[in-house]
């Protein structure tokens, strides 16, 4: 699931910008949940390529 979100964010950077600015939230998720997901994405995106592994 997270890899799908990452691919989506990479394909639609304007959506990611709106989510980061709290102008929108992911369907089915609260604004707090969306913020947590965006933080996880940012942490993943800023991490070293050798540490980019998801448990799920």
Swiss-Prot record:
Sorted UniProt keywords: Competence, Lipoprotein, Pheromone, Prenylation, Secreted
Propeptide residues, chain positions: 1-50
GO molecular function: pheromone activity
GO terms for cellular component: extracellular region
Main localization category: secreted
Cellular location(s): Secreted
GO biological process: establishment of competence for transformation
Disulfide-bonded cysteines: none
InterPro entries reported for this sequence: Competence_ComX_Bacillus
Residue list for modification Tryptophan derivative: 54
Post-translational modification remark: Trp-54 is modified by farnesylation, which is essential for activity. Modified by the tryptophan prenyltransferase ComQ before export to the extracellular environment. The type of isoprenyl derivative differs among the different pherotypes and depends on ComX primary sequence.
Top-level taxon in the UniProt lineage: Bacteria
Sites of 3'-farnesyl-2',N2-cyclotryptophan lipidation: 54
Pfam families: ComX (PF05952)
Function: Part of a major quorum-sensing system that regulates the development of genetic competence. Acts through the activation of the two-component regulatory system ComP/ComA composed of a sensor histidine kinase, ComP, and a response regulator, ComA.
Misc: The DNA sequences encoding comQ, comX and the N-terminal two-thirds of comP show a striking polymorphism, which determines the specificity of the quorum-sensing system in the different pherotypes of Bacillus. In ComX, the sole conserved residue is the modified tryptophan essential for the activity.
Summary of subunit composition and partner proteins: Interacts directly with the sensor histidine kinase ComP and stimulates its activity.
Protein name per UniProt: ComX pheromone
Organism: Bacillus mojavensis
Gene that produces this protein: comX
């Amino acid at each position: 699931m997270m890899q799908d979100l990452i691919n989506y964010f990479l394909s639609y950077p304007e959506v990611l910008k709106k989510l980061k600015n709290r102008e929108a939230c992911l369907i089915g998720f609260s604004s707090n949940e969306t913020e947590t997901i965006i933080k996880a994405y940012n942490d993943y995106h800023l991490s070293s390529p050798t540490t980019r592994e998801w448990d799920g």
